[in-house]
Regions:
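Glycine/serine-rich loop-strand microenvironments at binding/catalytic pocket rims
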Residues: 46-58, 63-67, 247, 253-267
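Short aromatic-enriched loop/helix-cap "lid" or pocket-rim segments at secondary-structure transitions
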Residues: 33-36, 62-66, 71, 132-133, ...
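N-terminal accessory/capping or targeting/presequence segment of soluble
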Residues: 13-15, 20-57, 61
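Active-site loop segments of alpha/beta catalytic cores
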Residues: 1-27, 90-329
Length: 329
């Protein structure tokens, strides 16, 4: 029988796994420093506001960042337009940050067992996210049309920064998975056209994918919402897994056409599971039905982004239990 680590890595690579792993409890995720403000003490100040390493102000939405999340402080903008970015943006000084101590300290705190558990490093605030965190969402969307040259320049600079983050992460942590984070879609469509994504973002993602693979690591990309139009592009540039594939995407279509080329992490009806009044058995039934439907259609791992400890606990228990029972052909 494979370990949790072996089963998860096999499923992410498209190899045979002995069972279906549960990601939240099945591996340890280390967060690369500098991209968020988590507060001096979330228990004492769960709704505190403070700066990340870029100077962007964040407000925590509760005491548990993994569930409660955080958001850019209401009304905050560092500046207004991308023709000003060189005057205002100061990239975090990676050479002077205690990256090794932070990453290793997180491993120690989380009691990582590298023999039994896969390790990922979450790198938040990708190119588009960082732009909208600096100048606001509306300004960021307009910038593709108003300041295309400046956006290209900023994204190229962001790419160099992220490449260095990857280099340092491999040097000091050597994780199995790099989990890049850049949201590109609403519930029903992408924030921008696929053509905009292909011009501005796809070349950056290709460089990141290549560097991650040079080190022998797996590239899992986080993007909430509807991104079905660019799944073939993600396959083309070498993304190994997309997380979370939400149900507004046509999961049946994605699994039929790309299920042997990219791992679909998700596929559960997050909104139904989190709805007030949804019972424990309904949550468990949703997990089982999607596992029955997709596990043998390709590279599939069930997953949700939880908004409550209750749903997370029920979901994780059902995936863990049923993942050992379901027949994998």
């Amino acid at each position: 029988m494979q370990t949790k680590k072996e089963a998860l890595l096999a499923r992410l690579r498209g190899e045979k796994a002995d069972f279906i792993p549960e990601i939240w409890t099945g591996h340890k995720q280390i967060v690369f420093p500098g991209e968020r403000y988590f507060g001096p003490n979330n228990q004492l100040d769960p709704y505190g506001t403070g700066p990340d390493a870029w100077g962007v102000m964040w407000t925590n939405m509760g005491p548990n960042p993994a569930v409660d999340g955080n958001t850019v402080a209401k009304g905050y903008k560092m500046f207004d337009n991308m023709d000003e970015w060189k005057e205002h943006v100061k990239f975090p000084p990676l050479d002077f940050m205690p990256i090794e101590q932070i990453l290793q300290g997180m491993c120690h705190m989380m009691q990582v067992d590298r023999e039994q558990e896969a390790v990922s490093c979450l790198m938040m605030s990708g190119t588009f996210e960082r732009m909208n965190q600096l100048i606001g969402f509306e300004n960021a969307l307009c910038a593709f049309y108003e300041y295309p040259d400046e956006v290209h320049e900023f994204f190229d600079a962001m790419c160099e920064y992220k490449l260095k983050c990857i280099d340092l992460t491999y040097k000091y942590l050597k994780p199995d998975i790099i989990h890049m984070h850049d949201d590109w879609g609403t519930n029903d469509n992408m924030f921008f056209s696929p053509e905009i994504w292909r011009e501005f973002i796809k070349p950056i993602e290709k460089r990141l994918a290549d560097r991650i693979h040079e080190y022998g690591m797996i590239y899992m990309h986080h993007s909430c919402g509807f991104i079905q139009q660019i799944i073939p592009d993600l396959v083309e540039i070498g993304v190994d897994a997309i997380n979370p594939m939400m149900v507004k995407n046509d999961i049946d279509y994605v699994m039929e056409h790309y299920g042997d080329k990219i791992t679909v992490v998700g596929g559960l009806d997050n909104q139904f599971m989190e709805r007030p009044g949804t019972t424990e058995e309904e949550i468990r039934a949703e997990v089982r039905s999607k596992m029955d439907k997709y596990v043998n259609k390709g590279r599939y791992i069930p997953f949700i982004i939880p908004n409550s400890e209750r749903v997370l606990g029920i979901y994780a228990d059902e995936v863990t239990r049923y993942g050992m029972e379901i027949e994998i052909k």
